Amino acid sequence: MLPVIPSFRSLVFATACLAALAGCAGSVPPQIQRLPERVELNSVPFYRGDMYQGAPQSLAAVLTSQGTVITPGLLEKPLHLPGGEAGLQQNMQTLAREYGLVVYPLDSDLSALLEQVAAGNPVLLRYTEGTAFWSGPRYGILAGYNRQKRTVLLRSGMNRRLLMSFSGFESAFKDAGGWAVLLQRPTQLPANVNPQRWLKAADELAGAGQEQAAARATKTLGATH
């Protein structure tokens, strides 16, 4: 007769499996667990290229997604390339404001980035690319993620769909300084917007000579808060 009560060894094995599964689920922050399981922003364009740390390609892709017809080559001179690689982070933000976009900085944690992607906002960021023998900064666009597989999807360099694990991406992202921004139209609030941060970004837009765009950004926030 087959035993009805499982053996002690079977119970131990089953308990261990359940504990392992619970541990895996618990390792993902609650803020991420609440997001949709999988998102990919297919409308975000991709410009292939490795030159200048991928900055012109990434910026052109975000500008295009916001309605500006532009190519990476047209951005090289305004970004002071070649020769201005050290100032790319600041120059990209300055140029985005000249196109009338609000440069909204994000917190440097994964949940904050994925929250924006889930809301349909591509994230412009910098991360470290390389190996144990060589590494360097690279700009890219966070355009998707898979919560179950714990991967993010980047538009970067020669890869339209560069997949990285959550942990690998977080390490590369923070190693490069944890810089990430949204480039938003003045009427397009980020998900879970921080009012003070948005108003500061609007002031910076006005300081770049885009007073009307800055006024629209302020009005948009006032209509919802």
Regions found by a protein language model. Name each.
Residues 2-13:
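Bacterial N-terminal signal peptides that target proteins for export
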Residues 16, 95, 117, 134, ...:
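A generic structural signal for short, solvent-exposed coil/turn residues
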